[in-house]
Swiss-Prot record:
Protein name, UniProt field: Probable chorismate pyruvate-lyase
UniProt-listed Enzyme Commission number(s): 4.1.3.40
Superkingdom classification of source: Bacteria
Family the UniProt entry places it in: Belongs to the UbiC family.
Binding-site residues for substrate, renumbered to this chain: 81, 119, 177
PANTHER family for the chain: CHORISMATE PYRUVATE-LYASE
Amino acid sequence: MTTEFYATPAFPVSKALQWTPPEQLELTPTQADWLLYEGSLTERLKQIGQQFSVKLLGQQLLAPNTEEKQRLKGKDQAVIREVLLYCNEKPWVFARSLFSPSAENANTLNLQQLGNQSLGESLFARSDLYCGDIEVAKVALEHPVARLNQQWFGINQRLLSRRRIFSTGGEQLLVSEVFLQPSPLYSSPNNRS
């Protein structure tokens, strides 16, 4: 995989976003199709991309932002994992996941061993997986992920993101995904982002 062009950002990359129920954003049919997709995003990307890979940006115990802390029931510390999902040798999605340190443990989800493997594949393979409601957000132009998108692809636009809580094995995980410019989410001619 050739990824030298896409310089690795400093970890952690992401900052807080303003999340809302999907019906509060005006989305094109293509945007809604991607943002509200209930299945594994990894599997969907693999179906349309000739090459799929994951690049781990970082995974460590940190303090979540205030809003994330509320969603994680007040936990002061969480393991924060940030990755880029590549299709056809381009980053299509920036993903940020938060979970308790116990979820890294081999006796639960064994997330410490994921490295450059997809969290989605691991989660959606579990029979006890519960998927919470999807929330969406527009990413401001000054957000670090939007700046990366501009740096990498020369396009200065508000990106779209989604997130939800997953529960499995007695653990909760908060997963957010920002769709970058090469992703099909922006292929609609009536793009309103």
